[in-house]
Amino acid sequence: MAAVLRSLRRRDVASATFSAYRSLTGSTKPAYVAQKWSCLARPFSSRPAGNDVIGIDLGTTNSCVSVMEGKNPKVIENSEGARTTPSVVAFNQKGELLVGTPAKRQAVTNPTNTVFGTKRLIGRRFDDPQTQKEMKMVPFKIVKAPNGDAWVEANGQQYSPSQIGAFVLTKMKETAEAYLGKSVSKAVITVPAYFNDAQRQATKDAGRIAGLDVQRIINEPTAAALSYGMNNKEGLIAVFDLGGGTFDVSILEISNGVFEVKATNGDTFLGGEDFDNALLDFLVNEFKRTESIDLSKDRLALQRLREAAEKAKIELSSTSQTEINLPFITADASGAKHLNITLTRSKFEALVNHLIERTKAPCKSCLKDANVSIKDVDEVLLVGGMTRVPKVQEVVLNIFGKSPSKGVNPDEAVAMGAAIQGGILRGDVKELLLLDVTPLSLGIETLGGIFTRLINRNTTIPTKKSQVFSTAADNQTQVGIKVLQGEREMASDNKMLGEFDLVGIPPAPRGLPQIEVTFDIDANGIVTVSAKDKSTGKEQQITIRSSGGLSEDEIEKMVKEAELHAQKDQERKTLIDIRNSADTTIYSIEKSLGEYREKIPSETAKEIEDAVSDLRKAMSGDNVDEIKSKLDAANKAVSKIGEHMSGGSSGGSSAGGSQGGGDQAPEAEYEEVKK
């Protein structure tokens, strides 16, 4: 027995086995278990408050979080050890929320309740042609919200894209908190440069729902340029950003620490998801041609095909061909069917060529708007996972006439740039200044349905612009102001951001009243519009929310739901931890009982076995208090082995060992017991 006790003493005190050892020495209430439980019960909010501003790249496919360490940004690894986190959210059969890799792993078996790529829906209307196109490509439901926005449905419940984004942001926030060891409440979040006002506002709402004070919304290409330019690099830079769901191109001038965006352009519905979908269509059609079976209606098969398409796309960036092998993809009367296709890089490039071609026009427009020629561009930065595709790099070379730089990590540069912007806002980084632009023209609808611009695209922000308008009819006492964003000449062809009325205008002949309309764009690119009757001084002002968008009440409700999810997650973690602790304790007790059964009375052994049985039964339930109670009871029961041995019942202990089996029997006495 001496050898047994010595080996127990050598074990890691942090293991739950130690509680069994403490029981053997006669402690009726193991301090370790109590301490572990109190640790589990401690809420997340006990972290000391920090004032770090984290940088988050909220991506369509993957997200990334970074923080400034001294003068340099550091990308933080998540709980799975990865530097990027899949922007995937799932609700399993128990209604539990899964985010990131765990959500992506179960997508094949739970396709209708696994939501991904919602960044493409954020700030969009349900009737938008792009939304309708997306609906045909995803296995989950996209539904029309009461306000007309596009929302998603999972487990019978509807969620706004901002909410789904908030679940991902919460994961990034927790990743940063685990690394920093303190709570985080401030963030800089990136968005595609070509996002309109509604999309920017919806992204800011997502941050609020996640419990973050969004200090700044920053454009992704600008963030990447910040990351690149940290090391005193200067010149005219083109940033080509092709990500999972969006495409942006920006021209920036870096000089003496000033990052000035000259122009930006893009396509908010072009990215890796479209490449996957093109490959998915090919696989479905190929299987239909060879097997005469249409897989497009089989959600489970489609999800397997989607995963295979994404994997093949990644592999073809470094190899010339790949095998797509999916056994038992479906079955018919003749039996199981398997999909086996060899895909070459040239075939893949042919399938996606029309998508790559779509990047050319925005690049040319951007160069034109910036008033620079190709030869003026000193360097081209590639950002976004899709820029690893060799054909994309070839097109970039053709557009800009020079090989793109590998100076930044395509997956991490944006988050690092966001962290740098956080450092600038906090005052830690003093030598850098960022001057960004508004991507789209802003204006109002005037007589005849004309779009009258007040602020042209690529105007440096923040900015403010006023213009005087008048009434279109005699004795008009109110005017409706329709706020629009876009580049088309007719108001109806542009994106309507919102509308409001200026009332109480004194009756007068048309053209006489003077109504001053002012547009104010802040550094986030978010618009405030005011209209003022110059004769009365009456003013009406709104911060633009699209006719959809989330109301304050809805945001508050979603914040509460997010807190509830966090509470449920904590309860689930507590349950798992206490079950693990109980499982380890059972193993230790049974091992001890096996070793000492013959040296203790049978009724003591029976009592221990019953306590273990009760603990096992409690473990199968979800009542944490019940498991804790049975765990304490089991530890108390097994302590009787120690009491019995120290009480001299085995006949081999010294006189000192017969002192009533006190709580803390000296260890030396046990070593005198012979087996």
Curated annotation (Swiss-Prot):
Residues 666-675 have a biased composition (Acidic residues). Keywords: ATP-binding, Mitochondrion, Nucleotide-binding, Stress response, Transit peptide. Residues 1-51 form a transit peptide. Residues 648-663 have a biased composition (Gly residues). Residues 638-675 are annotated as: Disordered. It is found in: Mitochondrion. It comes from the Eukaryota. Pfam families: HSP70 (PF00012). PANTHER family: HEAT SHOCK PROTEIN 70KDA. Belongs to the heat shock protein 70 family. This is Heat shock 70 kDa protein, mitochondrial. It comes from Phaseolus vulgaris (Kidney bean).
